[in-house]
Structure formats: C-alpha cells, structure tokens
Amino acid sequence: MNYQEQDPEVWAAISKEQARQQHNIELIASENIVSKGVRAAQGSVLTNKYSEGYPGHRFYGGNEYIDQVETLAIERAKKLFGAEYANVQPHSGSQANAAAYMALIQPGDRVMGMSLDAGGHLTHGSSVNFSGKLYDFQGYGLDPETAELNYDAILAQAQDFQPKLIVAGASAYSRLIDFKKFREIADQVGALLMVDMAHIAGLVAAGLHPNPVPYADVVTTTTHKTLRGPRGGMILAKEKYGKKINSAVFPGNQGGPLDHVIAGKAIALGEDLQPEFKVYAQHIIDNAKAMAKVFNDSDLVRVISGGTDNHLMTIDVTKSGLNGRQVQDLLDTVYITVNKEAIPNETLGAFKTSGIRLGTPAITTRGFDEADATKVAELILQALQAPTDQANLDDVKQQAMALTAKHPIDVD
C-alpha cells in the first residue's frame, strides 16, 4: 500500500490543492513557488531528527550531519546579506520577531512600529498580537498626501514618545524604505533599530532594494516570499547581539529546530546567491510596475501611493462598489487569488477592508512576463466592471486559465 492509499482523505485534499495552485493566478504577495530541491529537503529524513541547541553545542547526539546543514544555511545567509551573524532556526517570521524583541528589550518597554492600516504587520504592535500585549507600542503611519513614509514626522513622533526600539519594515508598503534615515532617527532618540524585511528580503538580496543590514542592530525576515524558500524565519544581526539572540530563539521561544526546513532554507539561500536570481527579482518588480500602470489608468480603483517600487501594491477598491473581502471572494471564483487589505485610515475593519493587496513573486516564478502581468491586471478590472454578469466572469476565468496553462508549475 502506498502512502496515498494509506490515507486517501488527506491526499485527496493535497491533490485538490495542487490543482488549485496549477490553475489559479497567485497574487498573494507573501506566497511563492519553491524549487524541487527545497520541496525535497522538507520531505527528507531530516524530519526524523531532534537537535536542540546549535552546531557543535547540541543537547542530543547524532547531529554531525545536521550541524553541516545548519552551518551551510548560516554561512549562506551571512554571505547573501553581508551580515556578521545569522540564526536560521526561527520557525516563522513572527517567531523571529518575538526572539528579536526578547533579545533587545524588556516587557513594557516603549517601541514604535508601522501601524497595521499603514501596512505594518501584526507583530509590529497590534493589540491582538503578543507584541502589543507585552510591549508598549505606538504606531507610526504614512503621509496623508503621498501615502508614503514621512521621516520628519516619524522623527518628531519618536522625539515625543522616546521609544527604546524602532521597528522599520512592513507587510503592505510598496515604496522603498530608507533605512539610513531610520538609523539616524533611532540615534537621535537613543533607540535601537530593528528591521523586518520579510517581504523585501529577496529584492534586498538581489541588490534591488536598500540593504538594512549595515544600518540595523537586528534584521528579521521570513525565508519564503521573495526569497523563494521554505516557510520559516531568520535573524541577522551585529555579532555583539548573537548570544542574546541565540538564547532568545532557543530556549527562549522554541525547542528543537525543524532540521528539514533548515535544509530547505540552505538550498534556497544557495539558489538566491546565483546570478539568475537577480534576473528573477528584477522581473518581479517589472511585473508589479506593469500591473500598477494598468490600475493607475483606471477610474475603478486607486493604487495606494500611486505605484510600487517592489513586488506588491495595495489597491483601494471602494469605487467599484465592493469591499476588499467581496473582491477577494469574487476574484477567487475566476481563479485569481488575492487577499483583502486595509488601506490607510481604514474605516471598514479588518474583516471587510477597503482594499486588496497584490504581489508578483509567484506569477514571476511561473514565467509570467510584463505582458502577462498587464493582462492579469486587465482581467481584475474586467471582473470588477461587471461583478454580477456571469458571462463576463466566465470569460475572465477562461482567460485566467489560458495564462496559467501557458505557464504551468512543474510539480513532477
């Protein structure tokens, strides 16, 4: 009996998900498609091993080869970003952030981070998240005119609030972030600087976005998204913070690391070091800009900040007569996957929202070019122009399926 026959219910769901990924245009900005090597590593025998501790200092025996894999991941991460120190054990970006906070500050300390409706992440101080419960966070927003970061306003806020830590980075901000300015702001108020580059890490690695490593005390990231690796987290830092971060990850936040995932991280980081990754990253940005141009030329939607410098954009869909959740559900019926997203000064709440977020990493991995990306944006607008016309929606779905058929995912 093979494994599919052993548990047909689970494998039926996996098979359906594989089909969904094959025929859907994936525009969720945090998703991507990993290589066969990354997938194979995660399904390898490394999942059988327990390895609490760090290379050369484990609490279990038999970790000679686990040490080799983790050391490769560490060294590749340091080389890719020019970092003095790397920890590749965090299970997720959220756990990387939790460990960074634990290493740098104490519960109750003041912290500034981007507010959720401005494009920040839950772990940047949301009241429903551990970060907002354990630490005294104050959110900073965007310039009301440009919907971009206003560094003078952030400085004034920091001078008034006097945080011990400033967090830069976002999960839905489409413009370049000036980490040098954030460093200057932190220095002026005597704060530490942490950067969460989870979304833009691949663009940073490719030299297409400013690198926060020279400026930040600590940098956290996920290893998926634009890095195109397995689901997981990673921390980069100045060497002087290494011991504190190691202790904050293990035993502070986690027990045994996921060795099979760390192997996937090592493989992905090796891929990211290759010249062709830079070409891929540039295509991500080109595709995003092509989509933003289509939306900017339409009266039906509004691109927050007027465009994008990276892999994503937030679209205000209010003029369409639908909210973000309705647009997300509508597009799902025509095989285009997006997520609802709050816009600056959101009034509808997190479960409806006034916007959607779009990203191009996954479609770029599939081979979509600027013409394809332009077509995808046009299909979204076509669906929004007549959201109750089934013939119109059927036409959009057929065109979406034609695009994915032209660029299939290699899953064999």
Swiss-Prot record:
Sites bearing N6-(pyridoxal phosphate)lysine, chain numbering: 225
Family statement: Belongs to the SHMT family.
Record-linked SUPFAM superfamilies: PLP-dependent transferases
Annotated localization: Cytoplasm
Record-level GO BP terms: glycine biosynthetic process from serine; tetrahydrofolate interconversion
Class of this enzyme: transferase
Chief subcellular location: cytoplasm
Record flagged with keyword Transferase: yes
Designated gene of the protein: glyA
Subunit structure: Homodimer.
Coiled coil: none
Keywords: Amino-acid biosynthesis, Cytoplasm, One-carbon metabolism, Pyridoxal phosphate, Transferase
Residue positions binding (6S)-5,6,7,8-tetrahydrofolate: 116, 120-122
Gene3D superfamilies: Aspartate Aminotransferase, domain 1, Type I PLP-dependent aspartate aminotransferase-like (Major domain)
Protein's name according to its UniProt entry: Serine hydroxymethyltransferase
Catalytic activity: (6R)-5,10-methylene-5,6,7,8-tetrahydrofolate + glycine + H2O = (6S)-5,6,7,8-tetrahydrofolate + L-serine
GO cellular component: cytosol
GO molecular function: glycine hydroxymethyltransferase activity; pyridoxal phosphate binding
EC identifiers of the protein: 2.1.2.1
